[in-house]
Amino acid sequence: MTDREEVVELRGHIIDSLIFSRVLDTIMEMGGDFEILEFKVGKRKTDPSFAKILVKGKDPEHLREIVSELRKYGAVPVHTQEVRLEPAPADGVCPRGFYTTTNHRTFVLFDGEWIEVEDIEMDCAIVVYPEERRAVAKPIREVREGELVVVGDRGVRVKPPERPRGRTGIFGFMESEVSPEKPTPTLIRRIAEELEWHRKNGKIVVVVGPAVIHAGARDDLAWMIREGYVDVLFAGNAVATHDVEASLFGTSLGVDLETGEPVKGGHSHHLYAINEIRRVGGLREAVEKGILKDGIMYECIVNDVPYVLAGSIRDDGPIPDVITDVMEAQAEMRRHLKGATLVLMMATMLHSIATGNLLPSWVKTICVDINPAVVTKLMDRGTAQALGIVSDVGVFLPELVKELKRVRDDEA
């Protein structure tokens, strides 16, 4: 074998998850060549498959580029060396050439042992703590001077998601594609069943934009919070503002939520709502004083559902609960996403993509938006596990709540 050739191995459900074909396609697309040295197909549904492939490049550097790309699919060189570690030169600075993570399960070979990287998310560095035999994914800004950072991709193994073997629900039904479908009863029923399962067995994070209120689905989301289908809520200043506006004035953006007609002087209602919350000190104080008596934020507070309101450069006010430091908001989102098993994103491109960037690839994700480009952007930016449903949230959410009630009645 020459310095232009290297043998890599693939293990797992590499056929029906299309990993094997993607590896071969990548080699050819990058101008390389390959030879399949060994290929064993699992005979039963639970049996993994195995492939050993000789990868050929035009020169050593070209080979290195190909093998580096193949690592994203879980390919590991047969003669794997241990990770190369270098100390961070300063707080918030990594060594040059540091390894940048994907959002897939990742392992590093250290002291003869494959160690799984904790807190994995895309676009981070990997810090190894030798005495604790731990490896942790960290954003660049959180790396401290002297910490040992993985440099290059030597000794790194990535395990991309495989096609689910057991219960798949809506995720098996939709096969991870952006769906142009309207929310049919069958589709929404499957989503409701998924939510019910995660309500009992997991942790549901819901990410929403203000269209939930504008489109008249505020009461439906409030019901979901009250009934335990929301463990954490992510939103921005606008959601809280228009939710309070709806509670105090019955309007959203100055439009009567019952009649759909603009209200005289309604253009000021959201500012009056912000001012009222600022006057008493915050949303919780407004609930305690009996000012805020219903709605999304009310249900979060009375049901002890944590929320993260992340600020934007265009915000009015903002409401005191809003985190205006974006790095602090991101850190809070990251903290609350730990242990999440299902994320439901509705009618917000900004917060959906921000949340998606923090998620491991095995967390089930549903994105609902009237604009198909939002779902496409979310997936293009790395959240490839997202299931997209193109729908008006004002239609989708009320139907989802109806199906959730039916699911609960059926199980009663």
Curated annotation (Swiss-Prot):
Asked if the record carries the keyword Aminoacyl-tRNA synthetase, the reply is no
User: So which domain of life are we looking at?
Assistant: Archaea
The record's SUPFAM superfamilies line, in alphabetical order, gives: DHS-like NAD/FAD-binding domain
Q: Which reaction does it catalyse?
A: L-ornithine = L-proline + NH4(+)
Q: What is its EC number?
A: 4.3.1.12
Cite a single Pfam family from the UniProt record: ArgZ-like_C_2nd
Q: Which cofactor does it need?
A: NAD(+)
State the protein's name.
Ornithine cyclodeaminase
